[in-house]
Amino acid sequence: MLDKLATERRNEQTMHLDEMSIEERLTIMNAEDHKVPQVIQEQLPVITQVVERVIASFRKGGRLIYIGAGTSGRLGILDAAECVPTFGVSPNQVIGLIAGGERALIQAVEGAEDSKELAVTDLKALHLTAEDTVVGIAASGRTPYVVGGLDYARELGATTASISCNRDAVISRHADYPIEVETGPEVLTGSTRLKAGTAQKLVLNMISTTSMIGVGKVYQNLMVDVQPTNEKLEVRAKRMIAEATGVDMEMAARYFASSKGHVKTAIVMILADVSYEEAVKRLERANGFVREAL
């Protein structure tokens, strides 16, 4: 079964990889990576459908849950973790599950990815509901842990999607919205942390970012729900206030303070010329969308 997968085949362009110069190896890796955005483009229609379902889940109080093993699981956890500071959401709104749990983030957990039951246990621990969207991630497209998770999610009526890097993947038959980004043979045979991992990360970026835009977490192209948890982010937050409203940095800093460090509230205060309390009310009525609050 594995030897028939494109991601497991030998790459004809790299049969003499060990004999190449460093620059030659880097050049061919770069050339192979350039193929990834092209194959993702072919999947944009189904990625669009997935985003629409995630937005619908969020609006109903549901969550986006990634589930995967190995590199795929780590990428899901990475994307989920970044949503908290970037969009100011609860850690419970976007969640990443990896076969074998936290220990699997830094070392292999033998047999974990081969257990469908383990995925069910992990999802039950999250109290999965029909309002959630579950995205199964597997470069091979056949990981039992992911299949088990998708099947359980469908039983509960949750929306399911899959991201694989092979055509006609097994997990595609277990998901409502299968995304198949066929990345082909790797530079290093079978090392799907390379092109396949890059493709998965790009698709996850698309899903989480555009879903958050769909629920009001972005104004213009600014991440106005950012959590300014360090000096760099605080400076960025003040700059966003200035850029969105046209005020200088000194004025932006004053509004940053009076808005209790909340960028979108400061923007509404300035552009609508209202108090902090009124800006908060407007944003609540507008479900967090700055344009509608103005």
From Swiss-Prot:
Protein's UniProt keywords contain Hydrolase: no
Keywords from the named record: Carbohydrate metabolism, Lyase
Gene Ontology BP annotations: amino sugar catabolic process; N-acetylmuramic acid catabolic process; peptidoglycan turnover
Active site (record annotation): 82 (proton donor), 113
Record has Lyase as a keyword: yes
UniProt family annotation: Belongs to the GCKR-like family. MurNAc-6-P etherase subfamily.
Record protein name field: N-acetylmuramic acid 6-phosphate etherase
